[in-house]
Amino acid sequence: MIRARDLLLLALLGFISSALGLKVSSGYHIVHNQPQSSFPNYHGFSYLQGSAPYVIGNSLPTSPAPQNPFSSPASPPVSAYGYSFPTAGRVSCAAPPAVCEKTAYRTLDGSCNHLEQPGLGVANSKYGRLLTPKYADGISAPTRSVTGDELPSARLVSLVAFGEQDVPDPEFTLHNMQWGQIMTHDMSMQAGGTQSKKHPTRCCTDDGRLIGLDTAHKTCFAIIVPPHDPAYSQVGTECLNFVRTLTDRDSNCQYQGGPAEQLTVVTSYLDLSLVYGNSIQQNSDIREFQGGRMIVEERNGAKWLPLSRNVTGDCDAVDASEVCYRSGDVRVNQNPGLAILQTILLREHNRIADALSALNPHYDDRTLFQEARKINIAQYQQISYYEWLPIFLGGENMLKNRLIYKAPSGSYINDFDPNIDPSVLNEHATAAFRYFHSQIEGRLDLLSELRQVLGSLTLSDWFNRPGIIEVGDNFDSLTRGHATQPEELTDINFDRQIKHFLFRRNMPFGSDLRSLDIQRNRDHGLASYNDMREFCGLRRAHSWEGYGDLISPPILEKLKSLYPSHEDVDLTVGASLEAHVAGALAGPTFLCILTEQFYRTRVGDRFFFENGDKLTGFTPDQLEELRKASMARLLCDNGNHISSMQPEAFRTVSHSNPIIPCSNIPQVDLTKWIDQKLYATVDPSHYGKK
């Protein structure tokens, strides 16, 4: 094996993304047609392409949608599920309701979305999996090499296999990256971890020394720092703190035996749980209970998220007078861009609630809250599936695999399948979606309405210090900046601010997000890169050279110097190094996982906004309006003083995507929500507008 010092020298040679020049001949046909596949829970997307969309016009269906041929037989959930939102380090599980009522609105904890299996997708449940976990002991121990030895240090792999060059993406803006974090936080949060700041469980001392096994907490899985680390060796850091995710074996869940399965404490659905919370108790803490509104606090003429009651605990604050927010998700304060979008989504709820109240003054608080929430979620799903996901998965891929449809504006897509498990896949949350950390930019520009750069912020200075967005005109300036500044290219480079300075507080260095991603892969016992390649219909590699179809020779040499065997390559690592599929922002292995996940997320959601159920759905006129929702409109309606935006806010400004007045950007006409039973002649000319 090559010495660690030599490997680190390789890391400094500046090899960047040779893989980006490779082309994948299979195009969007990610999965080969395998009717005899040994993976019964996989939907086989190349086969999906042969199925006709089930699109219905303005009348509701009189017969059920055709059965999805790729779903596994219905089976009861194998674990107990709970409803409480745990603090870091704890998880509380409870059984789902024995009986579900069919109501017009989602529950807050995700229960009863599937009426016959009410625990599917609920908060505090197990992640799903595509492949059996690969624990070292078959039960819960982190993954090891096929030789029985430990795998190479996650930090070493981060340094050698991944660069840190600044390569802006000419096509996509920082809002594209930031919306991805919104979706990530909405779908997944590992039990037992803060995931946004310094963890209370210490596996390393404050000066970076490893705590002995005899005194370390049982959940410790510290990342070993190589002795000649180009950053941490300057301050003598020997390890990076890492705490394992809690599983069904660690909690009071009804453990069913077999390998441990990690728990997620948020709902699996795209339901804006990060805005509304994952339980009645959590939601009650952030609701105003008047006019259907959520709590906001007014300062300096603007409306903000409510302040935390534990400022020094929730934020990296020196004293309790600093701005620190509370919301439906404890990670709200993690970075300025995230806090801005959570504020915008909260303001959007209240904007809708106020408009509905004016249109339907007979509505009580509960009806206004639920209707505003329902519309807010529908707009969010429209933006996510029809504006954001095509950038990542490719529009052609999504159409072929029935994630989106070219349907008439008022037509329903009745594709809900009660046999589809909507649970977030471990391979998705722990590996595939984390690849897009490469889009993070360490410099955040502040722009005027004329798009002149007024200044910039350094990301690591403002982790868990969100108060900067309330200073002066920073809220609008950062919002414009994120809509104008390019994100980092989706490649093998990770910005220095997250590779050496993550959550650094007042220290010279912080943690390394790419190292954390790799270590989490091993903590969760994810199947190897080679196993997942085969699962997704690619050729299994029988030697290092077998990876050459998707990974460039220089990168393969780096991997060979790191791993004892080609069978050891972590999924998070190998799939991140693949050449991208044309038209998408990922290689075929991650694209396979992402496509599978977002198919399940859509088809496994009874409340998905395009479904035409008479009780849970929208009218054809309302659905036609919801399809006008856009990221640009969301920003225009909920900034402080934003008056212009490009129509496609996830894409950089160009001749085909110019900055235009907000008044020219289509908006959802909320007058379509007038209760016709009581108000047949309301003059609605100004309702629903800013």
Swiss-Prot record:
Cofactor(s) this protein cannot do without: heme b
Binding site for heme b: H437
MF (Gene Ontology): heme binding; lactoperoxidase activity; metal ion binding; peroxidase activity
Cofactor note text: Binds 1 heme b (iron(II)-protoporphyrin IX) group per subunit.
Keywords: Disulfide bond, Glycoprotein, Heme, Hydrogen peroxide, Iron, Metal-binding, Oxidoreductase, Peroxidase, Secreted, Signal
Residues linked to a glycan: N310
Protein's UniProt keywords contain Metal-binding: yes
Xref: PANTHER family: OXIDASE/PEROXIDASE, PEROXIDASE
Protein family: Belongs to the peroxidase family. XPO subfamily.
Protein name per UniProt: Peroxidase
Organism the protein comes from: Drosophila melanogaster (Fruit fly)
Organism lineage: Eukaryota, Metazoa, Ecdysozoa, Arthropoda, Hexapoda
